[in-house]
UniProtKB/Swiss-Prot annotation:
The lineage of its organism: Bacteria, Pseudomonadati, Pseudomonadota, Gammaproteobacteria, Enterobacterales. PROSITE patterns: IGP_DEHYDRATASE_1, IGP_DEHYDRATASE_2. This is Histidine biosynthesis bifunctional protein HisB. Pathway: Amino-acid biosynthesis; L-histidine biosynthesis; L-histidine from 5-phospho-alpha-D-ribose 1-diphosphate: step 6/9; Amino-acid biosynthesis; L-histidine biosynthesis; L-histidine from 5-phospho-alpha-D-ribose 1-diphosphate: step 8/9. In the N-terminal section; belongs to the histidinol-phosphatase family. In the C-terminal section; belongs to the imidazoleglycerol-phosphate dehydratase family.
Length: 355
């Protein structure tokens, strides 16, 4: 059985990196990053194993004598251990960049044992560090990199991201007309992959994911040689079901969302993740198609989605350009969905006790 790991940089991530020489070679230079110990304790409780991996330029040379390094490093390790933070391994590259060694990050020689088959849970393992080389190491290992920063991605934030439930769902819908495969990750952004065979529809689905702040993968094979009806309808049904499943018991979600974005088009969207499917829709189009998408299928898509997602959805748009009118509906729905699915606690947002 594979194991989830965190491969964590030392200087600038676990402990502060002295700006004058970037070396922790005296005891008075040793300072821990804010909240690092509580975060690591929580991450261990969630099943992560910890590996420290660090480049220490010229370790063992006059540039960084071994004895100068060992004192602060050993004290750091003793403090971590005394608080219950345990590292499975400490991996150190002692070379200078110009040595062209095989073990310096972002090269992978030091982590080869974890890259063997059946060791690493790559979907739930991460490299955490403050430099671009840490992210490159993650890419080389085939896992996700997180760039630590006190202001934008500090230890409490990293801990929250890695310990919250991964709201994910996978739905397959196979009929005589279509084969639809949908995956959604509500707590991950970017990297959506969408292919329905209808190019403009792909673009619209990407608007939902982008403005909704989540990731989805959609693959559809259908009877487009007839028209786009079954492809759009069944994609809406499958996506709605996937969103409903990914939301789980809905505890902590905002439940409601409302947006009124005004650009060339005025689009209105109100959403209630109510458990009751209903659609109110108002949009008029000049032409029968936008790109390769039938404009009449826009309403049908949202009706199908609201039915399987079991939500109450109100959509309305006004404007002069059909392309922009259609896009405004998908964009407004995405922004509204972002509000409604956001988790802000653990209470069920219903006086009835059920959604």
């Amino acid at each position: 059985m594979t194991q989830k790991y965190l491969f964590i940089d030392r200087d600038g991530t676990l402990i502060s990196e002295p700006p004058e020489d970037f070396q922790v070679d005296r005891f008075d230079k040793l300072a821990f990053e804010p909240q690092v110990i509580p975060a690591l304790l929580k991450l261990q409780q969630e099943g992560y194993k910890l590996v420290m991996i660090t480049n220490q330029d010229g370790l063992g040379t006059d540039s960084l004598p071994q004895e100068a390094f060992d004192g602060p490093h050993n004290l750091m390790m003793q403090i971590f251990a005394s608080q219950g933070v345990n590292f499975e391994e400490v991996l150190i590259c002692p070379h200078f960049p110009g040595d062209n060694c095989a073990c310096r990050k972002p090269k992978t020689q030091l982590v080869l044992p974890w890259l063997e088959e059946g060791v690493l849970d790559k979907s739930h393992s991460y490299v955490i560090g403050d430099r671009a080389t840490d992210l490159e190491l993650a890419d080389n290992m085939g896992i996700t990199g997180l760039r630590y920063d006190r202001e934008t991605l500090d230890w409490p934030t990293i801990c929250e991201q890695l310990t919250r439930s991964d709201r994910y769902a996978h739905v397959e819908r196979i009929t005589k007309e279509t084969q639809v495969d949908v995956k959604v990750w509500l707590d991950r952004e970017g990297g959506s992959k969408i292919h329905t065979g209808v190019g403009f529809f792909d673009h619209m689905l990407d608007q939902i994911a982008t403005h909704g702040g989540f990731r989805m993968e959609v693959n559809v094979g259908g009877d487009l040689y007839i028209d786009d009806h079954h492809t759009v309808e069944d994609t809406g049904l499958a996506l709605g079901e996937a969103l409903k499943l990914a939301l789980g018991d809905k505890r902590g979600i905002n439940r409601f969302g409302f947006v009124l974005p005004m650009d060339e088009c005025l689009a209105r969207c109100a959403l209630d993740i109510s458990g009751r499917p209903h659609l109110e829709y108002k949009a008029d189009f000049t032409y029968q198609r936008v790109g390769d998408l039938s404009t009449e299928m826009v309403e049908h898509f949202f009706r199908s989605l609201s039915y399987t997602m079991a939500v109450t959805l109100h959509l309305k748009t006004k404007g002069k350009n059909d392309h922009h009118r259609v896009e405004s509906l998908f964009k407004a729905f995405g922004r509204t969905l972002r509000q409604a699915i956001r988790v802000q606690g653990d209470a069920l947002p219903s006086s009835k006790g059920v959604l």
